[in-house]
Structures are given as C-alpha cells and as structure tokens.
Amino acid sequence: MTTIFRLASSSSPSLRHDATPHNFHIRKTSISNTFSFSSKNSLSFKRILTSGGSRRFIVAASPPTEDAVVATEPLTKQDLIDYLASGCKTKDKWRIGTEHEKFGFELGSLRPMKYEQISELLNGIAERFDWDKVMEGDNIIGLKQGKQSISLEPGGQFELSGAPLETLHQTCAEVNSHLYQVKAVAEEMGIGFLGIGFQPKWERKDIPMMPKGRYEIMKKYMPKVGSLGLDMMFRTCTVQVNLDFSSEADMIRKFRAGLALQPIATALFANSPFTDGKPNGFVSMRSHIWTDTDKDRTGMLPFVFDDSFGFEQYVDFALDVPMYFVYRKKKYIDCTGMTFRDFLAGKLPCIPGELPTLNDWENHLTTIFPEVRLKRYLEMRGADGGPWRRLCALPAFWVGILYDEVSLQRVLDMTADWTLEEREMLRNKVTVTGLKTPFRDGLLKHVAEEVLELAKDGLERRGFKESGFLNAVAEVVRTGVTPAERLLELYHGKWEQSVDHVFDELLY
C-alpha cells in the first residue's frame, strides 16, 4: 500500500506540545511513501519504508535517522520562517485542538500511578477501544487513534491531545469519550484520575519518572537554569487550546491578544493551591512554577508587541533558545546549552558537522514554553488542569475571543495601552491573588467581566450555540472567587485541613 504524508503531520492545531517527532516510524504494515515540502528553496524530501505484517500497527516514538526526512540541500533561516507561515489557513479551515493532562492515582492509597500501572492502562485502552500503541524501545509510552493521541508527561501525567475539530460541541464530546474510555479501564485496576493543576499531596521524590529518553536530558538540565523546573516536569497539569490564523497579520493580532489576556485565563482556571499536603500560598502554583523554570524559554515574550514582530522575529528568538537534544539512530543526544543557530551552521559539538532537518526544527519549537507558543498554530498555555466542565470552558473562552473578529478587535483596543510592566505584573501577581489582583483603578475581576462578555458574544456570532460552555467560568467571574479559593474554603472547613479530600472532590 502507498500513503502520501504531509510533512511532519497536519499543521492544524492538533498534535503534541512535547518533542516527539511526527514523521513516525511505523512497523507491522507495509508502507512505501514519498512526500515533499515546497518552499522558496524548493526543498524536497523522500522516505521509503517497507516491512511486512498485519494491518494493526505500532508507532515508534521517533524515527531512526535512516528513515527520517533528509533534506537535499541545507536548511536556511527562510525555510524556518516558511515552516511557520505554512500554518496560515483560510477561516473555513480553522479548527480547535484541545489538550489536557491529569494525575492518575491509586484509589486506595492515593499514591501516584507507577509506570507498570500506566503501561497496563495504555495496553487496556488500546485493546478495548482500538488505539494504536506508541512505543519507545520496548516501552509503551502513548496511543494514537486518527488525529487524537494519548501521551505521558515526565511524572506519568496522562495527556489527551485532541483532534482538530470544528466546534466546541465536538471538543467536549471528545473529552467525554476519552474520560469514559480511561475510566472504564482504570476503575477495574483501582485507579482514579484527578483534575487539578499541581500534585496536591505527594513530594517530587514520590513521583515515578516515565521511560522517555528526552526526559532524562531535561531532568539533568532543569536544575542548572531554574529552581522549579523539576516540579514543572513531574507535578503540574494543564489544559490548553491550539488555534489557527489566516495570515502573518492575523497571527500577530491573536498572539498579542493571547499574551495580554493570558493572566486572566490563569486566574479564571486557577486550581493549584496545595503542595505536599498543605496550602502553598498560591491560587495557581502551576503558573508560578513557570516563572522559575528556565528564563530562556518561558514568559510573556515582550518582543511580540514590537512593531517589527512577525514570523521572522519568532524564528530569531527560537534560534537562540538553548536546545535540549537531537534524535539520531534511535537515541536522544544531549545538546543542552547549544543553540539551533549553531545547528544551522553545522556547529553542534554533540553531532559535529551535521545539519538540521525540518523535523529537528519542529522538535526544537516544542521545547520552548512561553505563555503563548507559536508553531504552525498558536497555543494558549496559561490555564491549570481541572474538572471536565472546565476542560470544555477553556477552549470556549479563547475561541470566543480569537475566532471572532469583533471580539478580537475589542480586546486589542482594550489592551493596546497596557504597558510591558503591567502585563508582567499581572502575569506574576495573578498566581497569588487571582481575580482580586489590583489593576489600574479597580480589580482584574472587572476586566475579566468585560472579557468574558466578549468571549460570549464571539461564540454567539459563530452560530453554533456554544456559549453555554462558558457557564463553568461565569460563576468565577461573577464572584471573583477562583476554583483554588473554593478548594481552600473546603480545606479550612469541612475537610478539616486534610488535602486527601481533594482526590474525591476533583475525581473525573
């Protein structure tokens, strides 16, 4: 059989934010495929794979070099710019891609799931619900079905990366179907799942590490660049939405609106007030952790608000973000501290003389972690994980604002005179004070009221009857009380200062 692949997966906002290369090496099926990528430099790529076997297949996490995309001429900076620009699509092709993570735990002991249990769970879901297994060596590390994938974060956080869908009704149905499947298998194993932004009870030493090569490299590097990076890896969960743009100008508008409003999203979804079994002084510990993870690859990207900003400026930024690794001969090679700019010039000491492929570039882009991230779509990354209604509300909030021209323009007008210092202040303070954060002559709550109205109006103008998905956050805006503050009320009240009750309260 012959399959034509588009380069490195569809550019719709569907696939992983981790650095698993997308030109998957597929076994147990016979494949002969050829694909090409057109740019101003007319790069062409070719790959042939053949092997016999049955129709069901296993997808390996990353391609061996010999099966990887090989460029017929060296990549240029323009190719990297063109790669981002290739995400532009007409409005009728805009989609919604939602990702969420959750903590698995033993229902009896509340202890985190071990890898052996996760492996059993993944195999169970694959067999019962017809998913294809994603392997790294002999270890199962994820599942794929159509354009959906399930993957593992470093501490075993269980992630669904949804397919690119047209409406929020489809998105919420996808989340419900996933939670049903996971629950069906997990309950038989005595496993539950928790929707929260930060591991509330267990210390970092209690969290098992998943057998993925890239995480070994990150684990060694993180303590060199920040004090909280390991907590980010092992103890946080998020929900994010990935959205399309029509042009460079549209990308810039959405990027700026997304960054300006990200602290409001952080406050609305703040849901991580406990660490090591006690209140931690934050409403979003998860968001705070990103402020001391790695300054080179995180933050509010002030340059996005420069008049000169565009695809090229993001490429310049990404070229100078230190790399984590390259993947060659079925192994992750540690390239920490070196830059993609060095790689482009063939000057990586870890693989002397080698030049990057677009696959390497795609992987590198996924190791950058700002509050809004650009790939061939935009990722809104400011929200804590939470219960299923909020998993549907987060994409609803951003779709209502960014996919409606009127609401988007109103947000841009509203935030146009916000200074860099104000945006940074909001980003840092909402993690503690949520919607009660003072802003200008009022509270952030007052801005959030206006923004939620714009999101609702934007959804109504879309005409799909989607505004009901905002109900899960409407109460937060009305009262100014974040989900985290509700949990703290319970902790100091009927839970009698025992965090164990949160595993029941936020059980999926």
Swiss-Prot record:
Transit peptide: 1-59
Keywords: ATP-binding, Chloroplast, Disulfide bond, Glutathione biosynthesis, Ligase, Nucleotide-binding, Plastid, Transit peptide
Domain of life from the UniProt record: Eukaryota
Subcellular location: Plastid, Chloroplast
Cysteines paired by S-S bonds: 172-392, 335-350
Changes after translation: The Cys-172-Cys-392 disulfide bridge is known to modulate the enzyme activity according to the redox status. The oxidized form constitutes the active enzyme.
EC main group: ligase
Membrane spanning stretches: none
Reactions mediated catalytically: L-cysteine + L-glutamate + ATP = gamma-L-glutamyl-L-cysteine + ADP + phosphate + H(+)
The protein's Enzyme Commission number: 6.3.2.2
InterPro entries: GCL_bact_plant (IPR035434), GCS2 (IPR006336), Gln_synth/guanido_kin_cat_dom (IPR014746), Glut_cys_lig_pln_type (IPR011556)
Biological-process GO terms, alphabetical: glutathione biosynthetic process
GO cellular component assignments: chloroplast
Molecular-function annotations in GO: ATP binding; glutamate-cysteine ligase activity
Record Pfam families: GCS2
Pathway: Sulfur metabolism; glutathione biosynthesis; glutathione from L-cysteine and L-glutamate: step 1/2
Family: Belongs to the carboxylate-amine ligase family. Glutamate--cysteine ligase type 2 subfamily.
SUBUNIT field: Homodimer or monomer when oxidized or reduced, respectively.
Protein name: Glutamate--cysteine ligase, chloroplastic
Source organism of this protein record: Medicago truncatula
Encoding gene per record: GSH1
